């Protein structure tokens, strides 16, 4: 039995609350169980210098954890004067994942920054950030469309969502919380589109290497999980 008492293929309760920020063009509070992430999408009518006069736009992301999002207070990275390697890795992953389903040419020379701030962490913060980040991005594009600045259907090519899977006590399981993740022999994150395209897979064996058959089981769980997340995204933005 999993520490969370869930079945091996059972995800945590997942919800999206849209429009939670008064100022951001798009926003979403996403909850994967006790992991809560505030995602905001902000529009700037400019692009990075290296993209000027290209006719293309840009989508990027930033990620951070509030000091008391964890069991003990963490020091703010700003007070340390630099971002940690984990933070940089995660925010680059979020940006890559969102750009995978965006037509940058259709966006035009405008930049959307998706900020993902972890309010409460209980495992899977990067997967929640990607999944909720898509909803915030969608709402930002809706805001732009209402002002004839972009077309949602032309810019946003598909859904994108992410889920974690791992091997806990020899059993492949989906959507690990912190206790499960810290004890898992194998941990993997899957990022996929609504059509089933693979954007990124991150997988690591913490102890014993995992087999090809075990990976196939994790992949099967992830595909079903992504389908569920995409359905929830569709209902959230309907």
UniProtKB/Swiss-Prot annotation:
GO MF, any single term: tRNA binding
Keyword entries, A-Z: Nucleotidyltransferase, RNA-binding, rRNA processing, Transferase, tRNA processing, tRNA-binding
CDD domains tied to this protein: RNase_PH_bact
Record InterPro entries: ExoRNase_PH_dom1, ExoRNase_PH_dom2, ExoRNase_PH_dom2_sf, PNPase/RNase_PH_dom_sf, Ribosomal_Su5_D2-typ_SF, RNase_PH, RNase_PH_bac-type, RNase_PH_CS
List of residues binding phosphate: 86, 124-126
EC category: transferase
SUPFAM superfamilies per record: Ribonuclease PH domain 2-like, Ribosomal protein S5 domain 2-like
UniProt EC number: 2.7.7.56
GO biological process: rRNA catabolic process; rRNA processing; tRNA processing
Catalyzed chemical reaction(s): tRNA(n+1) + phosphate = tRNA(n) + a ribonucleoside 5'-diphosphate
Domain of life per record: Bacteria
Transmembrane helix as UniProt keyword: no
Subunit structure: Homohexameric ring arranged as a trimer of dimers.
Entry similarity comment: Belongs to the RNase PH family.
Function: Phosphorolytic 3'-5' exoribonuclease that plays an important role in tRNA 3'-end maturation. Removes nucleotide residues following the 3'-CCA terminus of tRNAs; can also add nucleotides to the ends of RNA molecules by using nucleoside diphosphates as substrates, but this may not be physiologically important. Probably plays a role in initiation of 16S rRNA degradation (leading to ribosome degradation) during starvation.
Protein name: Ribonuclease PH
């Amino acid at each position: 039995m999993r520490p969370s008492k869930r079945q091996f293929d059972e995800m945590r309760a997942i919800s999206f609350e849209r429009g939670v920020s008064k100022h951001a063009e798009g926003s979403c509070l996403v909850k994967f169980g006790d992991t809560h992430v505030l995602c905001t999408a902000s529009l700037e009518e400019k692009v990075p210098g290296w993209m000027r006069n290209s006719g293309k736009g840009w989508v990027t992301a930033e990620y951070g954890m509030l000091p008391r999002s964890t069991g003990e207070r963490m020091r703010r990275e700003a007070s340390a004067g630099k971002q940690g390697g984990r933070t940089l890795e995660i925010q680059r992953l979020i940006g890559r994942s969102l750009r995978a389903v965006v037509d940058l040419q259709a966006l035009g020379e405008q930049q959307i920054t998706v900020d993902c701030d972890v309010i409460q962490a209980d495992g899977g913060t990067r997967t929640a950030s990607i999944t909720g980040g898509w909803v915030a991005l969608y709402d930002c594009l809706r805001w732009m469309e209402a002002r004839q600045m972009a077309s949602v259907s032309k810019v946003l090519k598909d859904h994108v969502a992410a889920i974690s899977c791992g091997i806990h006590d020899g059993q492949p399981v989906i959507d690990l919380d912190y206790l499960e993740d810290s004890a898992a022999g194998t941990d993997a994150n899957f990022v996929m589109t609504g059509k089933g395209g693979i954007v990124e897979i991150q997988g690591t064996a913490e102890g014993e290497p995992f087999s090809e058959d075990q990976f196939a089981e994790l992949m099967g769980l992830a595909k079903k999980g992504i389908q569920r997340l995409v359905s929830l995204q569709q209902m959230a933005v309907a």
